[in-house]
Amino acid sequence: LNFEVGKDASLSELKEKHDAVLISTGVYKPREIEIEGSDLNNIYPAMEFLTASNKKGLGDKVENFDNGSLDAKNKDVIVIGGGDTAMDCVRTAVRQKAKSVKCLYRRDKENMPGSSREVANAEEEGVEFVWLSSPKKFLGKNKIEKVSVDKIKLGEPDESGRRKPIIQENSDFEL
């Protein structure tokens, strides 16, 4: 908001004036999905999508938004994941007037790491959650046209305490 650390005030000055200084840079290195078809066009990392949307909302020129690549308007959107970043993506896609928004998550609602409030808000906004599902491969010629999805069953809890996802044999379906 028109403030740059080091230019408008030094980090030392901020520390002197405040009880705490929180630096929230977030995670900017996407996790790669290593499945067949992950090299197809129109598959984007979450932060690229969210950053483009935020910049556009601030009035910036964003080439990949302006050319339609990162604009969800009138598109069928699938978001993979169950954390707060995934919830930000599904809700942003809804606000951009996507035709449909689905969220694939490999566990059930009770074992999801994201905020339950965010999930409830996304559901109220029309996001369809496809619980107990995991992408198997992306299908298409040059760009993604469908996603082949495996159904999941939950096993025993893992180190995190959440039940471990196990792929159900011969259960795949397409979205």
How would you label these PLM feature ranges?
Residues L1-E32, N54-N67, R95-L175:
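A Rossmann-like FAD-binding core segment of flavoenzymes
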Residues N2, P30-Q96:
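Glycine-rich dinucleotide-binding loop and its adjacent helix/turn
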